[in-house]
Amino acid sequence: MKKKVAIIGAGVSGLAAIRSCLEEGLEPTCFERSDDVGGLWKFSDHIEEGRASIYQSVFTNSSKEMMCFPDFPYPDDFPNFMHHSKLQEYITSFAKEKNLLKYIQFETPVTSINKCPNFSTTGKWEVTTEKHGKKETAVFDATMICSGHHIFPHVPKDSFPGLNRFKGKCFHSRDYKEPGIWKGKRVLVIGLGNSGCDIAAELSHVAQKVTISSRSGSWVMSRVWDDGYPWDMVVLTRFQTFLKNNLPTAISDWWYTRQMNARFKHENYGLVPLNRTLRKEPVFNDELPARILCGMVTIKPNVKEFTETSAVFEDGTMFEAIDCVIFATGYGYAYPFLDDSIIKSRNNEVTLYKGVFPPQLEKPTMAVIGLVQSLGATIPITDLQARWAAQVIKGTCTLPSVNDMMDDIDEKMGEKFKWYGNSTTIQTDYIVYMDELASFIGAKPNLLWLFLKDPRLAVEVFFGPCSPYQFRLVGPGKWSGARNAILTQWDRSLKPMKTRVVSKVQKSCSHFYSRLLRLLAVPVLLIALFLVLI
């Protein structure tokens, strides 16, 4: 008899989970509280309780070749960085193409998930849902939590003395939709993340004055990188990851800081992070530096206190006559339908083995998909997480002992502290993490074998973008089109921009080899510098 799996949420994580269950011969039932797939990317012009929310102008920060489902490339004419409506179109197309919609119960929120009385022997769960006021409970052999982590706003009001006296409007960035109503107003944005920078840059075109308050600063990256290519196709390579993790720390830190300052010197703009060498996820914004340069956005330190109409910053300066304060301060991790101790089993921190499995459960029949942050895209991560989880639920893969899993969590937390500091417990190193998950299911590319068998492909896999197709080259669920997708990914990235015929200066292959030479030159120079210094 097929094992029944309850999947909560029909965003990209939920769709990956449904598909993975079907690939492993499991029987999925997905519960989605809204009336459509897409999750975070399904735009609504109003705020819906219990659902993620985005603003009208949102574009992706990952490019199309790096954020697709591994066996389902985007159409050639799709732009590299998409408006949310184009991504929603792709997600819907994927769900239809893979015949996933029939496994989804829409407008059916999950109200509770509880262990069955005999959980210690069966690992089964009681899942209670509610539709049109009617509650139903069903028993499942396993559950996959795919409801995301952009639902419950984190607004640290206690950290801002006097905020209760402030007479202007005050709300979280989750409630922001479009800039028109703030025309001619004075706006303070608290937080220097992606949402805060997007909102501030957009508001600066209509507001009288926009100020961003940041406690610790941030690196601000452009989506456009070397030679005008998408940043992630140039930066997220196995070669660069190898250098980052194996060069001496001093050289690695110097190289990282140099990369971050390649576009502009952050110190001059008041943006430089307090700790410049931490690998916290940078902000992606192509417009913010220009808005600062034009005087339309001002960067300030943390707010010391509020008055009725103003904000006093820690440097003693003030922003007066404020009409609105927008808290772009992130989200909390919460699953109200689930016992909180399952996900946060220690010190109120997310405690999951490899970011997926609660280690303390008697049976490994619950998986959390998509509860990670990374410099890489979410879709390929959720695909690998779901494939691994489905194999564990089926019994094809097994997990280590509880002690071994907890030891691994402790080790990973130490590594995260080194690279990302103490503020981001769910951030991870993209390629290292993807390879780790892929190795569990036999989907990790064998580079040595590739260099012997298919040198052309091997060079692109190692030196080129670590695109999702790499994880469907081998193993269960391998895709026959993966090799061609990898070898033609640069062409697809250029296709939507070639709307005017120009004379060719050089062929794409010469571009590849020139890029390869530049990449090889950097570590040679760094190693030479290191040898001179010692």
UniProtKB/Swiss-Prot annotation:
GO molecular function, one term: trimethylamine monooxygenase activity
Entry's localization field: Microsome membrane; Endoplasmic reticulum membrane
Entry membrane topology: Single-pass membrane protein
EC code: 1.14.13.148, 1.14.13.32, 1.14.13.8
Keywords, in A-Z order: Endoplasmic reticulum, FAD, Flavoprotein, Membrane, Microsome, Monooxygenase, NADP, Oxidoreductase, Phosphoprotein, Transmembrane, Transmembrane helix
Signals that turn on the gene: Expression is specifically repressed in male mice after puberty, preventing trimethylamine degradation. Trimethylamine is present at high concentration in the urine of male mice after puberty and acts as an attractant.
Catalyzed reactions per annotation: trimethylamine + NADPH + O2 = trimethylamine N-oxide + NADP(+) + H2O; N,N-dimethylaniline + NADPH + O2 + H(+) = N,N-dimethylaniline N-oxide + NADP(+) + H2O; hypotaurine + NADPH + O2 + H(+) = taurine + NADP(+) + H2O; (S)-nicotine + NADPH + O2 = trans-(S)-nicotine N(1')-oxide + NADP(+) + H2O
Chief place where the protein resides: membrane
Cofactor(s) needed for function: FAD
Any one of the GO BP annotations: taurine biosynthetic process
Modified residues (Phosphoserine): 401
Stored InterPro entries: FAD/NAD-bd_sf, Flavin_mOase, Flavin_mOase-like, Flavin_mOase_3, FMO-like
Top-rank EC class of the record's enzyme: oxidoreductase
Miscellaneous field: Trimethylamine is a bacterial metabolite found in some animal odors, and is a repulsive odor associated with bad breath and spoiled food for most organisms, except for M.musculus, where it acts as an attractant.
Name of the molecule in the record: Flavin-containing monooxygenase 3
Organism of this sequence: Mus musculus (Mouse)
